[in-house]
Amino acid sequence: MRISEEAKTARIRYILILVISLAGWFSLGGMLTLVLKRLPFFSETKTGIFIVTFVPHLVLLLFLTLLVRYAFREKLTVLVGGKGTREFLTTALITLVVTGITETFSLGNIVYNSTDGWGEKALFLVLSAVLLLPQTLAEEIVFRILPERILSPEERNLGRCRRILLAFFCGIFFVLPHLLNTEVTSSSTPVIPLVTYFLWGFLSSLLGTYVHSYVPVWAMHYANNFFSVVIVSAEKTTLTGAPLFYDKSEEYSPLLIVTTLLAFLVVSLFFRHIGKREDKESFSG
């Protein structure tokens, strides 16, 4: 399929944004993290250690914001699309419910965290709610939105084959930065978190192109990370916080994969229902 010169220029810009942002993420973000870790607050306190883990993502989001503004004269939120806050909150709530019900059964030895007081738990609840927003938004843009724009710079509806190809690429792309994560390197069953990461990348891309918006995908990503950090298994992830509960087991159950599939299925059915209802209302009108 032939594309216009304007689309070719846009593709080159998207590629440059992706490359420069990733370079800034790993170089400037990494160096800033190392500098901050030399300070007592960021190296000795649990709050500081938790905050500093988000620094590379904040740098990444800053790069993305400036580059998109310079290259396309538009806000970063335009890339995400969607209907806004209601769509985000609804999807996040659905994901939290599905994840909360199913993933709890996939964990091993769940122990109540009685070390930290409720004040510290509340602090981490607020920190998680705030810091996970830029973290997950930056990852959605880099791992889902920019690859789609590079493959289809004219924003036409992707065919089935190209959509699956894009999703497969996004799945592999999403796995790569997580290869050194604690849940992969220290687990006796690393294949389960790796498959889960691939499914998140693959299914997120399919959902985003299906509903023509990445707001639901961003919301699912946010809700899943929020659940993992605040409620359970934060002890063995890179985002160590002060969860209400934590899982002492170093093994991951295959139910984690089932949880991922179920969450995407429920959200997809929800948006399919919404789409049919809107079509019916527009037809009646």
Feature roles, as predicted:
Residues 5-22, 77-93, 214-218:
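Alpha-helical transmembrane segments and their helix-start/interface "positive-inside/aromatic belt" motifs
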Residues 1-73, 242-285:
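N-terminal, membrane-interfacial amphipathic/helix-forming hydrophobic leader that caps
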Residues 62-77, 105, 138-142:
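Juxtamembrane interface elements at the cytosolic ends of transmembrane helices
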Residues 125-285:
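Transmembrane helix-loop-helix hairpins at the membrane interface
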Residues 37-44, 77-78, 107-117, 182-188, ...:
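Membrane-interface helix termini and inter-helical loops of multi-pass transporters
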Residues 44-53, 76-138, 148-158:
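Juxtamembrane helix-loop-helix connectors linking adjacent transmembrane helices
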Residues 10-18, 45, 49-53, 57, ...:
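Residue-level signature of transmembrane alpha-helical entry/exit and packing/kink sites
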Residues 27-40, 104-111, 233-236:
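Membrane-helix interface motif
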